[in-house]
Amino acid sequence: ALTVRNLFSAGLIGLLLVIALYHLARYLMRRTDLGSAWFTLLCVLVLVREFTLSRMADYYPYVPTDEIFSFLIRVEFLSFQMAGPAVMGFVGVVFPSVRYRVLTRLAWLASAPYILISIFMSIQAMSIVLKSYYLIMAAQILSTLVYLTYCGLRGRKYAWVGLFGCVVLALGATHDMFFAHGFQGSGYWTTYCFGVFVLVESYLLAAQSTHAFKQVEKSRLDNLEKIKAQM
């Protein structure tokens, strides 16, 4: 079972690496494409979390050293705490809103103390304190889903695509939290959800870029028609 789990994990990590490099290249070629920048960060965070969880599963039967376990658990917690605000940052760029960006800043401020706790506190104290972060994570998920639903109802293009991806991610994150605390479930579901989220949101960025290029091309052709009419 562990070998099969590692195959799924390796597949997701490979997918994340390829898509992250692709969107990083898009951002480097066009620095105004902040959606690709945020999505690259998201891919890296999910990749780090998947990698650390799979490594902890590998080390578990062999009783890892305190240093290895401490490093893995800290990195895993950090990726989890940064993921929520990063998703909000991505959504706020793809579907701009002043009010939602304020919520995104508040999410980073609320997550900052927990990020510091994950870096500096002991593992035992950290595990107890960080349980309260689930409430903050739930608020981040709920606010994002409500905002994307609002965008969809207002007719924002591709908002429903973004909502579907975030719903899948929310299900994966919720399952991950329960699974990590000993509730019955399968680690595969989290991997599936993360993979679907990455593919859906990557499609969203590609669809938005294609739509923008079509609008530019249409404007160019309209201008050519006007010039021909004046000649």
Q: What does each model-identified segment do?
A:
Residues 38-41, 114, 200, 226:
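A generic membrane alpha-helix/interface feature
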Residues 2-30, 131-154:
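First transmembrane helix
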Residues 31-45:
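Alpha-helical transmembrane segments of integral membrane proteins, especially early/N-terminal helices
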Residues 224-231:
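PAS/LOV and related PAS-like sensory modules
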Residues 33, 46-222:
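Interfacial "cap-and-anchor" motif at the non-cytosolic start of specific transmembrane alpha-helices
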Residues 24-27, 51, 224:
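Short linear motifs in intrinsically disordered/low-complexity regions
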